[in-house]
């Protein structure tokens, strides 16, 4: 199956690896742009980008999928790829309706906790703090 993967942190890497290792065609990975980190503000690529590069999968890093030149380029690429499915794991952006309607079989979002109760940047920690 032709699957576009969208994810960013370490949490998303096992899902990407499982898709590749189980023979799915992954024509593209979308992830957040590299960000400066540490004292020297060295640009660090997201974990998903590093994983995709290990498998020689093309990587897209748009600032936004909703507006601007990045969004237009990303939509053009997605239309050309024509994915059967998009899998989203901790991507860090809300997908516009146009992206959600593009794949033949739709989109699947994998989240680290119950939604909508534990949405946001620290869902696992919030579950633990609530004793769940």
Give the location of each predicted region.
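One-carbon transfer enzymes
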Residues: 1-132
């Amino acid at each position: 199956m032709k699957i576009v993967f969208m994810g960013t942190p370490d949490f998303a890497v096992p899902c990407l690896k499982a898709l590749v290792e189980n023979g799915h065609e992954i024509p593209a990975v979308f992830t957040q742009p590299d960000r400066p980190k540490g004292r020297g503000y060295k640009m660090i690529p997201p974990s998903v980008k590093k994983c995709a590069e290990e498998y020689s999968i093309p990587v897209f890093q748009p600032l936004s999928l909703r507006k601007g030149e990045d969004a237009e380029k990303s939509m053009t690429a997605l239309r050309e790829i024509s994915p059967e499915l998009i899998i989203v794991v901790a991507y860090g952006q809300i997908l516009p309706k146009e992206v959600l309607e593009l794949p033949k079989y739709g989109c699947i979002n994998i989240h680290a906790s119950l939604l909508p109760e534990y949405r946001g940047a620290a869902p696992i920690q919030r579950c633990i703090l609530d004793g769940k």
